[in-house]
Design a protein with these regions (language model features):
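Active-site glycine-rich loops that stabilize anionic/oxyanionic intermediates
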Residues: 26, 34-37
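Catalytic nucleophile-loop/oxyanion-hole region of alpha/beta-hydrolase
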Residues: 36-38, 65-95, 99
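Conserved alpha/beta-hydrolase
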Residues: 41, 46-70
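Short beta-strand/loop motif that positions the catalytic acidic residue
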Residues: 210, 216-218, 222
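Short alpha-helix in the alpha/beta-hydrolase fold that links the catalytic acid
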Residues: 212, 226-235
Length: 273
């Protein structure tokens, strides 16, 4: 597995990216991580995909990982979609004339779905795992009201993101690794949280506009993102393949169902080539 790091620059931000190259690349997977984490947490996925001749290109979002800027903040949702566009172009430059798939988890799942709906054709397909379309909990009303006020007067102020590390996986080692990862944070600005909540609602309502095949994977035990939002999205488009894993936790690629889930991803990608 050949690995290289790279950077790109937009919105006065230096983005950190990495590429894991397969020996014989049949397709390239552009990966977008979830809230509070970073692309380095997907090395095991990249390794498995590489073993099946799929190269992987990933990056750290605004306010995350090794990308510069204030933790948990982005300039706008449009800027998020532009960062996805740039990483896709990077992938095309690394692997010319190669089919490209977008793969997003949670927050990244929201980003790739909205990108596909608003920005693009020319993708082979999309994989979205536990996509942030609908929260599994109601944010405290006072916190939501404060967030809306701050978005108007101080959009970069950050507060806690309400994620409980114990809710990411049923495997204790994964929870401990998450807690002890120095690049993981729990910060989020109103400009980040509210725009993703709104874009998730919009995506569900406009799913019928999707023109690209999408694999939707979610777990019924997710305490962070409501799997029923993913179900509703699937119902609203003819392009979706949906699979639910019973009782799993939010990070299904780090949960007890991870082997089955990765097999499903690999089989679906292969079916789209």
């Amino acid at each position: 597995m050949a690995h290289k790091e790279f950077n790109f620059h937009i919105y006065n931000t230096t983005f950190y990216g990495q590429c894991w190259k397969a020996k014989n690349t049949k397709a390239v997977i552009v990966l977008a991580h979830g809230m509070g984490e970073h692309s380095g947490r997907y090395i095991h996925i990249a390794k498995t995909l590489n073993e099946h001749d799929f190269s992987v290109v990933a990056f750290d979002h605004f306010g995350h990982g090794k990308t510069t800027g204030k933790r948990g903040h982005n300039p706008s949702f449009e800027a998020v979609l532009e960062s996805v566009a740039v990483i896709i172009e990077k992938a095309r430059a690394f692997f010319p004339m190669t089919p490209v798939f977008l793969y997003g988890h949670s927050m990244g799942g929201n980003a790739v779905i909205n990108y596909a709906l608003k920005k693009t054709t020319h993708l082979q397909g999309i994989i979205a795992t536990s996509p942030f379309l609908k929260l599994a909990f109601e944010p405290p009303k006072i916190k939501l009201a404060l967030g809306k006020l701050l978005q108007k007067i101080a959009p970069s102020v950050t507060i806690g993101n309400e994620i409980n590390p114990n809710d990411i996986s049923r495997e204790k080692i994964e929870v401990d690794t998450y807690i002890n990862d120095p690049l993981i944070h729990s910060k989020i600005s109103p400009n980040f949280s509210l725009t993703f909540i709104d874009s998730g609602k919009w995506a569900i309502e406009n799913a019928s506009q999707l023109t690209i095949p999408i694999l939707l994977l979610h777990v019924t035990g997710d305490k962070i993102i409501d799997y029923r939002g993913t179900q509703k999205f699937a119902e609203n488009t003819k392009r979706a393949t949906l699979k639910l894993y019973k009782n799993g936790y939010h990070e299904l690629h780090n949960d007890l169902c991870k082997k089955e889930m990765l097999e499903d991803v690999i089989n679906w990608i292969s079916s789209q080539l």
